[in-house]
Regions:
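Glycine-rich segments within core transmembrane alpha-helices of 12-TM secondary carriers
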Residues: 42-49, 127-146
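Helix-to-loop junctions at the C-terminal end of transmembrane segments
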Residues: 47-63, 145, 149-150
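C-terminal membrane-cytosol helix-exit motif in multi-pass small-molecule transporters
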Residues: 164-176
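Cytoplasmic membrane-interface "Motif A"-like loop-to-helix N-cap segments
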Residues: 57-72, 153-155
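C-terminal ends and interior cores of transmembrane alpha-helices
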Residues: 69-87, 147-150
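Helix-loop boundary and gating motifs at the non-cytosolic
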Residues: 1-53
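Intracellular juxtamembrane helix-capping segments at the cytosolic ends
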Residues: 20, 103-118
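Hydrophobic core of transmembrane alpha-helices in multi-pass small-molecule transporters
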Residues: 6, 75, 87-106
Length: 176
């Protein structure tokens, strides 16, 4: 799981509202209401946790979590392929919202996996270490992407493809 936490956040950071918001504003030059929708996406996603709990019942949790991660990676690739036209804005925003909903499902299922993998008395410490790794990776990637986004005009595809490749590694590490 530690290796997954080193790789998966690379792709997840690229779908955060702040990053997508900058891309939507600078590259796609969207209206303010679109930026508001992007900012609200995580709140929509949090409401889906109840649904994910029901959908994952009687399913293999690690496999289910891997499918959710794969869905997030597909969203990354859709962003990479989004043309800088109105259709691209729809692809960008839809992918961002879908990825947040899928990520909410992943977080919901992952908590069940953690409860099965770690004894109650060490679970907090173990999951805290995993989250610390993910946070450090997220900070490093966010700090690295900022300057890149300042200097690009429309060439965002490469960073999203790299994020998707890192995410595939995360799926492989989770399945081990």
């Amino acid at each position: 799981e530690r290796w997954m936490e080193c790789t998966l956040p690379i792709g997840l950071v690229l779908l955060e509202g702040g990053v997508i918001g900058v891309i939507a504003s600078k590259v796609f030059q969207v209206e303010p209401w679109v930026l508001a929708l992007i900012s609200a996406a995580p709140m929509f996603a949090n409401l889906s946790s109840f649904l994910w709990n029901k959908l994952s019942l009687a399913k293999k949790k690690v496999q289910f979590a891997s499918y959710l991660q794969l869905g997030v990676l597909i969203c990354l690739l859709i962003v990479a392929l989004s043309p800088v036209i109105q259709l691209g804005v729809v692809m960008l925003v839809t992918s961002m919202i879908a990825s947040r909903i899928l990520l909410a499902g992943f977080v919901t299922v992952r908590s069940v996996v953690w409860s099965l993998n770690y004894a109650r008395d060490i679970r907090g410490q173990a999951t805290g270490q995993l989250q610390m790794i993910a946070s450090v990776v997220s900070i490093i990637i966010s700090a690295s992407i900022g300057p890149y986004l300042d200097y690009i005009s429309t060439n965002i595809a490469i960073i999203y493809i790299i994020g998707a490749i890192a995410g595939v590694l995360g799926i492989l590490f989770l399945g081990r």
